[in-house]
């Protein structure tokens, strides 16, 4: 945009002065001689002196006042646009900061979820260890009972002694009262019988004891095998769940790494694109600068040629004026005073003309500088607009990615909730089965001590069940807390 008009009031004033000088010029040689002497003798005043002496016309003042008002209005518009761009950039930075905080919170929640899974696996391992310890203690109890029975069979009980044994759950009472009475009754008869018959009975009893011992050993081994198989099944299930959880965590980590890599690639592409754009702008600006410099050099050359041409014309006119002075100096001495006043007037007009030229050059330089500043501001505005569009597109893509990740987390949470519900149902079913078994066992037993023992065991099992239910409630509350946190995110 060029603010310099094609024909300003300065140009009209200069042309008017030149016409006036041309109309009153060539008729008087003395005037031209004094003009040349004044041009050689008069020094060029400073800018402050010229501005102090300058009396611009009303048209010139109105013209430049209008130009300055237009420049100020354009400057205000540009400042408003820059303020809008600044607000948009601040809002974008705020959104980016909030997005980064949400990503950090999601990462922390994922870490907490993985920690909770690890704790759950540890609790399950602890429960399995307790189950295995319980089985081991039961097997050991059976072994101890068998040893006690063997010792009682070898030693023999007293006359009125009755021993009760619990074989395996459900607790069944084994009453050995008849065998003991038979053994007591056989003692006097054995003393009266023959020694051969007693030896046969001893051998038969030994064989029966050995067969019973083998049967007990086989039952104990079968119980151990069943307990080990159950432990192995639980361990395999737990290890499978651990492997699945680790694979799921690995998949999530791989997806996060891929998303981060894609973001880095997009950022690199944007930076390279902006670099190429700035390089192109730099190339264009340097090219324009060199072109303007070359044009200015050509203009300076033309101005120098015009100056030389004008100086040659001035020397010619001086020579002609001297010749005419020599010819006409003797003819018109009366007009010397009028020529002197005219020369002074011409000198003042020339000074004004020079001052106006300097002032016009100064205004032209100011207009050129303002045009350059306006072009620079427009270029910066275009660049910022492109950057804003790119950033808005990136924010839209990031929002889509975050919504997808949130949907995946919601799906995963729903699956985990279903898994917890199924676990709770299975544990409740096991608890009901255990209560039924205990009820049946209590209904089958008739002895008072056995009922008391069964009631104690029922109470212990109820305590354990309440403890497991409390742990399940805590886990459920943690899951609901994580769900609420994810919804808030």
From Swiss-Prot:
The protein, known as: Coiled-coil domain-containing protein 77
Domain of life (superkingdom): Eukaryota
One Gene Ontology term, aspect cellular component: centrosome
Phosphoserine, modified sites: 38
Entry coiled-coil feature ranges: 57-120, 212-487
Residues of the signal peptide: none
Keyword Phosphoprotein: yes
Species of provenance: Mus musculus (Mouse)
Transmembrane intervals: none
Alphabetized UniProt keyword annotations: Coiled coil, Phosphoprotein
InterPro entries, sorted: CCDC77
């Amino acid at each position: 945009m060029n603010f310099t008009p094609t024909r300003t009031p300065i140009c009209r004033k200069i042309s008017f002065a030149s016409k006036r000088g041309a109309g009153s010029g060539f008729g008087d040689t003395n005037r031209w001689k004094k003009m040349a002497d004044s041009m050689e003798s008069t020094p060029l005043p400073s800018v402050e002196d010229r501005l102090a002496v300058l009396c611009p016309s009303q048209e010139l003042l109105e013209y430049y006042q209008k130009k300055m008002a237009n420049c100020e209005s354009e400057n205000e518009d540009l400042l408003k646009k820059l303020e809008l761009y600044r607000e948009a950039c601040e809002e974008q930075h705020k959104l980016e900061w909030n997005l980064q905080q949400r990503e950090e919170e999601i990462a922390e929640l994922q870490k907490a979820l993985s920690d909770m899974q690890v704790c759950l696996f540890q609790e399950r391992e602890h429960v399995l260890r307790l189950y295995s310890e319980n089985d081991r203690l039961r097997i050991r109890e059976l072994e101890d009972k068998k040893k006690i029975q063997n010792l009682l069979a070898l030693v023999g009980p007293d006359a009125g002694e009755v021993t009760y044994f619990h074989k395996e759950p459900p607790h069944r009472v084994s009453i050995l009262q008849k065998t003991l009475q038979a053994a007591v009754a056989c003692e006097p008869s054995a003393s009266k019988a023959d020694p051969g018959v007693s030896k046969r009975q001893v051998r038969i009893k030994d064989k029966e004891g050995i067969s019973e011992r083998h049967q007990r050993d086989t039952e104990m081994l079968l119980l151990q095998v069943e307990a080990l198989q159950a432990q192995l099944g639980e361990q395999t299930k737990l290890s499978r769940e651990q492997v699945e959880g680790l694979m799921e965590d690995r998949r999530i980590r791989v997806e996060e790494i891929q998303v981060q890599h894609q973001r880095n690639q997009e950022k690199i592409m944007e930076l390279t694109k902006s670099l190429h754009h700035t390089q192109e702008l730099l190339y264009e600006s340097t090219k324009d600068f060199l072109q303007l410099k070359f044009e200015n050099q050509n203009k300076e050359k033309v101005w120098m040629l015009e100056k030389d041409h004008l100086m040659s014309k001035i020397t010619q006119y001086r020579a002609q004026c001297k010749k005419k002075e020599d010819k006409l100096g003797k003819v018109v001495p009366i007009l010397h005073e009028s020529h002197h006043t005219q020369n002074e007037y011409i000198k003042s007009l020339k000074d004004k003309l020079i001052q106006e030229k300097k002032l016009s050059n100064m205004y032209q330089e100011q207009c050129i500088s303002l045009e350059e500043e306006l072009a620079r501001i427009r270029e910066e505005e275009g660049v910022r607009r492109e950057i804003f569009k790119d950033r808005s597109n990136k924010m839209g893509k990031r929002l889509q990615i975050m919504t997808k990740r949130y949907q995946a987390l919601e799906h995963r949470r729903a699956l985990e909730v279903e898994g917890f519900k199924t676990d709770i149902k299975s544990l409740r079913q096991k608890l009901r089965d255990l209560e039924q078994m205990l009820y049946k066992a209590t209904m089958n037993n008739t002895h008072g001590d056995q009922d008391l023992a069964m009631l104690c065991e029922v109470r212990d099992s109820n305590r354990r069940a309440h403890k497991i239910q409390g742990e399940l409630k805590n886990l459920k509350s943690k899951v609901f807390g994580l769900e609420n946190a994810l919804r808030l995110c």
